[in-house]
Amino acid sequence: MINAEPIISKMKNQKINYDKVLKKLIGQWEREAIRPKILLHSCCAPCSTYTLEFLTQYADIAIYFANSNIHPKNEYLRRAKVQEQFVEDFNRKTGANVKYIEAPYEPHKFVKMVKDKELADEKEGGLRCTACFEMRLDIVAKAAVEHGYDYFGSAITLSPKKNAQLINELGMDVQKIYDVNYLPSDFKKSKGYERSIEMCNDYNIFRQCYCGCVFAAMQQGIDFKTVNKEAKAFLEQYPD
């Protein structure tokens, strides 16, 4: 399968536009009549909207919901259910066949990682976020190898609040550890973020007010009691 590294290496003396890298990679798939299988980490349904609309034109996608950073548990369950429901609705509306896979919810591992690295007091966007991105990219890469996918990647680059340059650099580093290719991206480019807002309205998708991290949420003054109450009320619609 085609590796993005040769494309990126030609841009080393400039700020890398990972949206262009992805489109060049897709061009190579098309020239070689390749339709790869991609295991795509998604942090939430909103970030997967435009991302799926774009990628399903060229590849077979499975959404991998691996987000043990989300707190509290009911909020995690709400976001997972919203993600699963969007995949079902997207498939029904478009005729796509996107799969939904949910990783184990293991928040103790995330908290331990943060405390072991002494990152609890980091500001959002700092080293704690870097460690969180790396942890989740590692999880999805490992799963991609186990399940035979050609690429692993993340929909999180759609968010204008997240550092796509950093996420892609981490993804390329993780790629070196596992026998699977990283899918570079910057999905917010080419009006991807604007399209995601339209799709959230079209599909009536819940948009959360914080990333999910308990440490960042406490810094922001998030009211966990209210979050938990609202999430619990939502989940009561799905008794199974």
Swiss-Prot record:
EC number in record: 1.17.99.6
Gene from which this protein is expressed: queH
Pathway: tRNA modification; tRNA-queuosine biosynthesis
One of the record's GO molecular function terms: epoxyqueuosine reductase activity
Membrane-spanning parts: none
Main function: Catalyzes the conversion of epoxyqueuosine (oQ) to queuosine (Q), which is a hypermodified base found in the wobble positions of tRNA(Asp), tRNA(Asn), tRNA(His) and tRNA(Tyr).
Pfam entry (one): QueH
Alphabetized UniProt keyword annotations: 4Fe-4S, Disulfide bond, Iron, Iron-sulfur, Metal-binding, Oxidoreductase, Queuosine biosynthesis, Redox-active center, tRNA processing
PANTHER family the record matches: EPOXYQUEUOSINE REDUCTASE QUEH (PTHR36701:SF1)
Keyword Disulfide bond: yes
InterPro entries: QueH
SS bond list: 211-213
Substrates-to-products reaction catalysed: epoxyqueuosine(34) in tRNA + AH2 = queuosine(34) in tRNA + A + H2O
Record protein name field: Epoxyqueuosine reductase QueH
Family: Belongs to the QueH family.
Superkingdom of this protein's organism: Bacteria
List of residues binding [4Fe-4S] cluster: 43-44, 129, 132
Biological processes, Gene Ontology terms: queuosine biosynthetic process; tRNA modification
